[in-house]
Amino acid sequence: MINGGDYFKNEILLISMATLYLWYSFRYARKTNLEELEIPTKKIIGQFLVTFLISQLFYYTGIQFLQIQSDSSASFAENISHGYSLSLMLSVSVISPIEEELFLRGFVQKGGFRNSWLGIFLTSSFFSLLHVPNDALSFIYYALSGFIYGTSYKYSKTLWVPILCHIGHNTIIVVRSFFYT
């Protein structure tokens, strides 16, 4: 890890490396015809809004009633206790969602499983494991979040919908942390 978990250390290097990695990932996805990353149409924007609304309703239900906990949320809380850094906010709200969606939905779900329901189920489970849930209920919660993103990709046929939903979701978490920490 470039910053050793300290988002203030080597902040510019971390942002530069992540930007380079994302640029290369998008380039690779386009070159291999894994995904047509064109400007989103009105239909795609509509699909994004519906999926985002569903994911946010699901998120607030999980937060209000289920007390979902994971090592990734605990790590985020620990990092912001030391203050906010640009690299932390970009990593959580933009970089990680793009990386996760390109890899899980693009490479694994579409590339490995041809966008099948089995692929959605497996990538949803892997998505949950990436967030290191602390109990079975948290695992199910994160897997269902992954299922929402995977299903949105299957029906929209573009990575823009799950990418934008995931970015929006994580950005709301970052913004909420300004007010509730």
Question: Model regions: which residues?
Answer:
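Alpha-helical transmembrane segments in multi-pass membrane proteins
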Residues: 1-29
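Juxtamembrane helix-loop-helix connectors linking adjacent transmembrane helices
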Residues: 31-96
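Alpha-helical transmembrane segments of multipass membrane proteins
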Residues: 1, 17-21, 51-59, 169, ...
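Membrane-interface helix-boundary motifs at transmembrane edges
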Residues: 4-6, 31-42, 107-114, 153
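Non-cytosolic membrane-interface motifs at loop->transmembrane helix junctions
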Residues: 6-13, 72-79, 138-149
